[in-house]
Regions:
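Acidic, Ser/Thr- and proline-rich intrinsically disordered linker/docking segments
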Residues: 1-16, 69, 75-157
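Short regulatory "switch" loops immediately downstream of catalytic or recognition motifs
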Residues: 36-37, 63, 99-102
Length: 157
């Protein structure tokens, strides 16, 4: 589930995240602007400066300023669409994706938009696509190789 302004990430040194078991940090992108749009209510949260970190399990944003309305965002890769990278003519490039299942209970889907005023957007797009593809492969292997639970069935003679 996607989490916004979660207590477990507040109070940490800005730009750092606590990794989960078996989670690897793939890349960090400073000076990002992030906007989260909750659908269908059209409620939006925004931060104009922070670090986006792509890990093997999720996308994490931490704001540079604690006073921002969007302090932290954590989105598991499996709840996010592939996304698209846009290069508008008159503003900073951005990446946009649809995400599902927020923990706050107010919405079951929304959009995340990450702007890159200082560059790095193409690298971000490649990193997150690679992470999502790897997550899909690992998940597929887990589904195929389920653990054997044994049964209480006796043999028939």
């Amino acid at each position: 589930m996607a989490t916004v302004n979660h207590a477990s990430t507040r109070g940490q040194r800005r730009g750092t995240i606590r990794t989960r078991p078996h989670e690897r940090i793939l890349a960090s992108y400073p000076n990002c602007h992030v906007r989260v749009l909750f659908l269908p209510t059209q409620r939006a949260l925004e931060s104009r400066g922070g670090t986006c970190t792509v890990s093997s399990q999720r996308l994490v944003f931490t704001s540079n300023q604690a006073s921002e309305e969007l302090d932290t965002l954590s989105v598991p890769l499996e709840t996010m669409s592939v996304g698209k990278y846009m290069l508008p003519i008159f503003c900073a490039p951005y990446w946009q994706a649809t995400m599902t299942h927020f923990t706050d209970g107010t919405s079951d889907h929304g959009q995340v938009i990450v702007r890159f005023p200082s560059g790095g957007g193409m690298s971000f797009q490649q990193t997150i696509r690679t992470a999502q593809a790897q997550w899909d492969i690992e998940r597929h292997h887990e589904d195929i190789l389920r653990t054997y639970q044994g049964s209480n069935v006796s043999s028939v003679r």
